[in-house]
A protein has these predicted regions:
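Short alpha-helix in the alpha/beta-hydrolase fold that links the catalytic acid
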Residues: 124, 138-146
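Acidic catalytic loop of the alpha/beta-hydrolase fold
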Residues: 132-137
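Catalytic histidine-centered segment of alpha/beta-hydrolase-like enzymes
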Residues: 157-171
Length: 182
């Protein structure tokens, strides 16, 4: 990005596993970033290594089921009330084009990353968004962010389901990104 003349980004955004990527990009400080938004972002597991392997395996197998079974199986395996058939078909198509190795590495790296210790001082404003209905699911992630990054601004979204903001309410997403506080 610097080679292209960019010296600063307004924001990086990541949802779920992408939240872990957004956080690591902000912590890396390779370019100035004003805002880092983790939307239901996954924080590093605070569990024994062997337990994290089983969690990664479960997640991987769920994705492989979706990859193999297509839309019909995705409808049975996941809460899909908010998504249209076209949305689910898109997910099935994307999964079908991902290799098994790519899916495994995705879960392994996004769930088991390390935050530098001590946490570096950054000028980036951190934001953690989660929906009203997923507070229990995100309890450990929220506690982790509060302990490691006490300056984080937390926002509770309307009930959209996990990862529903961008897909289901793109206008609200655009408004929220535009209105991030400096």
């Amino acid at each position: 990005m610097k080679a292209q003349g960019y010296t600063e980004l307004y924001a990086v955004y990541g949802c779920s596993m992408g939240g872990s990527v957004a956080l690591l990009v902000a912590l890396g400080q390779l370019i100035k970033i004003k805002h880092c938004v983790m939307d239901g972002g996954i924080t590093p597991y605070q569990l024994p290594w062997i337990v994290t392997r089983f969690i990664a395996l479960k997640d991987y197998l769920m994705m492989m089921i979706g990859r193999t079974g297509g839309v019909g199986l995705l409808e049975k395996a996941f809460a899909t009330d908010e998504y249209t058939k076209e949305d689910l078909q898109y997910v099935a198509d994307v999964l079908r084009h991902c290799s098994r190795k790519t899916l495994w590495r995705t879960f392994d790296s996004c769930n088991n990353y390390k935050v530098p210790d001590p946490v570096p001082t950054i000028d980036t404003k951190l934001h953690y968004w989660y929906t009203n209905g997923e507070e229990k699911e995100r309890k450990q992630d929220i506690a982790y962010i509060k302990s490691k990054f006490p300056q984080t601004e937390f926002t509770v979204l309307p009930e959209l389901g996990h990862a529903g903001l961008v897909l289901l309410k793109p206008e609200l997403f655009e408004q929220m990104i535009s209105e991030l506080s400096d």
